[in-house]
From Swiss-Prot:
Enzyme Commission number, as recorded: 2.4.1.21
Binding site for ADP-alpha-D-glucose: K15
Gene Ontology biological process terms from the UniProt entry: glycogen biosynthetic process
Enzyme class, spelled out: transferase
Protein name in UniProt: Glycogen synthase
Keywords: Glycogen biosynthesis, Glycosyltransferase, Transferase
Metabolic or biological pathway, per its Swiss-Prot or TrEMBL entry: Glycan biosynthesis; glycogen biosynthesis
Function description: Synthesizes alpha-1,4-glucan chains using ADP-glucose.
Catalytic activity annotation: [(1->4)-alpha-D-glucosyl](n) + ADP-alpha-D-glucose = [(1->4)-alpha-D-glucosyl](n+1) + ADP + H(+)
Amino acid sequence: MKILHASAEYFPYTKMGGLADMLASLTKEQSRTEEVYVALPLIGKLGKEPNWTGKEVGALLPQDAKEETIAVSLLAKARFREAIESGVKLYFFDSELFSGLNSIYGQADEHYRFAIFSYACYALSQILQVDVFHAHDWHTALSLTLQKNSTKPIPSLFTIHNLAYQGDHPFWMTGFLKEDPFYLITSPFDQDGKCNYMKAGILSAGQITTVSPGYREETLREPNGFGLSYVLKKRKADYTGILNGIDPDEWNPKVDKRIFQTYHLQNWKEGKRKNKEHLYREIGRPNVSLDLPLIGLIGRLTYQKGFPTFLQAFLERRHLPHRYVVLGSGDPETENAFFHLSDMMPDVFYFYKGYNESLAHQIEAASDFFLMPSLFEPCGLNQMYSHVYGTIPIVSRVGGLRDTVDESIDIQFKTGIVFEPNDKSSLGYALERANDLFVSPERDHVVKNMMNLDWTWTKRKLEYDRVYKIAIELLE
């Protein structure tokens, strides 16, 4: 089977969140048995220099583009450049729209940029003559509408990674697209008087998935549908929740080259202690006791991730002996609060603004617990990384966290600490339970349960194969 994925993110080239990790690990697994391609923008600052093959693909104009328009002009000057990564063929969209960017998101005209990128992805799918076209999130959703309206549509799948981001904008911002004979702004795009790419993707795709069964259920009702639950209900029969997986070559304490000391189930205590000692030296906190529980937090400092609730709970439970290492960036107020705590309580709290892949691995390996107080979480990957690294996750009971972390009364099944509702009292009580667990013999059983879990893509790839088959049968 020939599969083309279209995405704004792909690790390690354009990573802003879990989408990049998910797609890189999924396609790596798929490439073992299928012919896999990925289309992504070529921005000015990539996380890694691609392994270019020298092959290029041009002529990106859809066959029915007969008039000279802005979109046609931009596509005529663009091309895809091929590279290889872990057996996957990557097609970087080389266009003046993206070449000057240091970050894939955040531009005022990003709706315009991703509209043109979606045109190009649609054209590439026709050129490569793939069997399945798989688009990810709103950035590539317009390509699904083009597929649906094509005289030769390709079976398609749309994966929703985060319904909170919908690519909605005033119609005038991409009004120029009305001029193109192969693009029509019609009712699928209209949501509350705005052009909504996510809605168009949901209504246009042959099949729809999201990244956990729990998040699928949540998005079928408001407020978790962010205004689109009624659209998803229309496609409920075609909507599937499939948990993400992780790459065992990338996230595995047995072979991780980014951590100070590799370890496994039989020596996890020794391994984590050495990694904790190394991390404290690296962040300038060499005098912190290794016998105190360390809690790691990694993520974008956004409303979704629940950091304000954490701050409230932390201040109310500051008598607990926990130490914290936080890696992330985002909301300025949250950043300032974390910097303040880091300055005022240096032996208790450390904050690194930004994202650092090596530090992320070191935090997972060194921490005793990993906190995810998300208000909603489509899937989450860090709780899976934490399981593999013997780092007990403390999570809110939402979305994919609910599907993957179990605070069972039966010690044989316990794989973390879960709290609800998501407020300072519930989170504070969860922190107290973590403190008790840290010194309890029960901790050994929990870590064993976690490190024996299988979060690889082997089973999940088969679930995607099943959905691909349904999409193909719809067009036969």
